[in-house]
């Protein structure tokens, strides 16, 4: 199976036109751009296309509403939005999960600060 993998394209900063691909599956692994324009770009592929959101898809929003928006926009297209889900194609199992954290857990300033501290320690 041939897979075309695209990630961190940041299309709002660097627009990109891709040539047609002969891949069996297209995987969009996050950070395309905001949901509406990112999904419009994702829908260009004729192949089954998997879209796993990255942190940039959530800017100015939250996980639940952004995922709902992406799923709604994917309806009627070959794009499948994966969030803690799997999809099987030609005997291959694809798993998708966003690795983004909302540091406003329970809207508690203490929890947000603790989460940010933990993230900074992890990066070091």
Residue ranges and their predicted role:
Residues 63-87:
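Glycine/small-residue-rich loop that forms an oxyanion/phosphate-binding "nest" at active or ligand-binding sites
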Residues 48-50, 80, 93:
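Proline-centered loop/turn at the N-terminus of a beta-strand
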Residues 13, 91, 104:
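Solvent-exposed, flexible loop/coil residues
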Residues 10, 56, 88, 101:
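Residue-level detector of flexible, active-site-proximal loop/helix-junction positions
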Residues 52-54, 84, 97:
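Generic beta-sheet signal
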Residues 1-51, 58-66:
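N-terminal active-site segment of His-dependent metallophosphoesterases
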Residues 95-124:
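Active-site-proximal loop/helix segment associated with metal-binding centers of metalloenzymes
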